């Protein structure tokens, strides 16, 4: 009959003092090696984080600066002629057309509690400068209680083949607004909507001024406009309001229109 002997497990799994020391030494080497490998990785991650943080901050700030979603009184100077308004003077950094030299710098006053609106890239002319075939929007400002204003620019060649034509070269005020009317209303233009026209001279520059009642316009039931031509561009300044806005802010809106000039 076969017999089985039991061998103490402590002897099988026992580790000699020399082996134990060797294992500990190897463990220290492995740990040290792992730490050395991790250190460059940590440094790399820290460097990436240092670069990424300012970028994230810029992304958070960009929408505010791009849309200027603050009241214009917080960053525009007071108008010298009337301190109840602030003065907006367009600079080359403001629009693609100004940077390209297609539009001469312009200016107008605004109440200090108005805000600048963001303009979609496709409407800003950014994609077609310096030679745009279609009109584009330069800048736009708004106050929900008073109304909105926008500067629209159109290539002169849409209205005449004469280089450097003046606004007078384009015809009488009624003829010019017939071409530019849809850019005032946002949809269509009917000559019956035109209430009044006038001609203004500021220095060497002539402006056509319009008062329109536009019940079906997308921009509002009341529109004021001022048009002039210089270089290769016709510039149209539009002041729009709903019936409620017009009733409370007519004089303010008229003052804004009168202030516009190249």
UniProtKB/Swiss-Prot annotation:
GO molecular function, one term: calcium ion binding
Keywords: Chloroplast, Disulfide bond, Plastid, Thylakoid, Transit peptide
UniProt signal peptide: none
Keyword Chloroplast listed: yes
Any one GO CC term of the record: chloroplast
Primary localization: plastid
Cysteine disulfide partners in this protein: 128-132
Gene3D superfamilies: Mog1/PsbP, alpha/beta/alpha sandwich
Top-level division of the source organism's lineage: Eukaryota
Swiss-Prot/TrEMBL GO biological process terms: photosynthesis
InterPro entries according to UniProt: Mog1/PsbP_a/b/a-sand, PsbP_C
Coiled coil regions, renumbered to chain: none
Compartments, as annotated in UniProt: Plastid, Chloroplast thylakoid lumen
Signal among keywords: no
Record function comment: May be involved in the redox regulation of photosystem II.
PANTHER family listed in its UniProt record: PSBP DOMAIN-CONTAINING PROTEIN 6, CHLOROPLASTIC, PTHR31407
Family: Belongs to the PsbP family.
Protein name: PsbP domain-containing protein 6, chloroplastic
UniProt lineage: Eukaryota, Viridiplantae, Streptophyta, Embryophyta, Tracheophyta
């Amino acid at each position: 009959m076969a017999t089985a002997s039991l061998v103490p497990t402590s002897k099988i799994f026992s580790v000699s003092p020399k082996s134990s020391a060797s294992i500990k030494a190897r463990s220290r080497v492995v740990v040290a090696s792992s730490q050395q490998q991790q250190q460059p990785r940590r440094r790399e991650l820290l460097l990436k984080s240092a670069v990424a943080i300012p970028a994230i901050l810029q992304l958070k700030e960009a929408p505010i600066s791009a849309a200027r979603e603050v009241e214009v009184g917080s960053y525009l100077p007071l108008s010298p002629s009337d301190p109840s308004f602030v003065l907006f003077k367009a600079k080359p950094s403001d629009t693609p057309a100004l940077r390209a030299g297609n539009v001469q710098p312009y200016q107008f006053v605004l109440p200090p509690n108005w805000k600048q609106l963001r303009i979609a890239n496709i409407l800003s002319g950014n994609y077609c400068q310096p030679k745009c075939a279609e009109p584009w929007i330069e800048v736009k400002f708004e106050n929900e209680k008073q109304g909105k204003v926008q500067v629209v620019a159109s290539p002169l060649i849409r209205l005449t083949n004469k280089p450097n034509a003046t606004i007078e070269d384009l015809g009488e005020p009624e003829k010019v607004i017939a071409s530019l009317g849809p850019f005032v209303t946002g949809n269509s233009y009917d000559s019956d909507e035109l209430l009044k026209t006038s001609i203004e001279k500021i220095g060497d520059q002539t402006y056509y001024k319009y008062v329109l009642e536009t019940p079906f316009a997308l921009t509002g039931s009341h529109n004021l406009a001022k048009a002039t031509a210089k270089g290769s561009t016709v510039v149209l300044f539009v002041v729009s309001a709903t019936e409620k806005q017009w009733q409370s802010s007519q004089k303010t809106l008229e003052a804004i229109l009168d202030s516009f000039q190249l």
